[in-house]
C-alpha cells in the first residue's frame, strides 16, 4: 500500500503440504509468506472447515479495507470425512473464526467426551490439517483431558482471542 499507493484485495489459494504426491506437486512455503509479514500488510490463513474457508473469502470481499489474503489449501482436507460444516455454519449469523476450539465441545459430535475445562490437563495448539491427525490420535488413546485448539489465522496473529480461550483452562 505505502509503496504503490494502492490497496489490493488479491486472494492467493496455495497448495500446502507435499502429502506424498511426489516432486512434480508444489507446496507453498508457509514460512516464506510469514517472513514477508510486517505491519499487518497481508493476511495469512490456514482454514480447517469449509465454513471458515467460506467466511474468510466473504470477509475479504465485504471489508471496508483491502489487504492481500494468502490461503493455505491442503488437498487432503477435500477428502477428509471429519472436515465438514453444517449448513447453519455458512449463514450470516456466523463469521470467520481466527481460532477454533475443539470439535469435541460441539453438542452432538461423535467424539470423545472431554472433561470440564478446569480439569483439562493439556492444551495442544496447531494449525491446518495436523488437527485431524491429532484428533485421531486422541481418539485412539481415549485421552479426555487433552483439548486441541486450531489457529486459523496465522497473520495478523490472534493473540487476544487465543488468550481469552486459554484463560478457561486453569491447569
Predicted features along the sequence, with ranges:
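Conserved thiamine diphosphate
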Residues: 1-118, 132
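Short glycine-centered, acidic/aromatic-flanked micro-motifs in structured strand/loop junctions
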Residues: 14-16, 126, 150-153
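A conditional alpha-helix N-cap/helix-loop micro-motif detector
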Residues: 26, 50, 127, 155-159
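Short, surface-exposed connector motifs at secondary-structure boundaries
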Residues: 38-41, 116-120, 143-146, 169-171
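Acidic/histidine-rich
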Residues: 123-130
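Generic long, charged, amphipathic alpha-helical segments
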Residues: 131-170
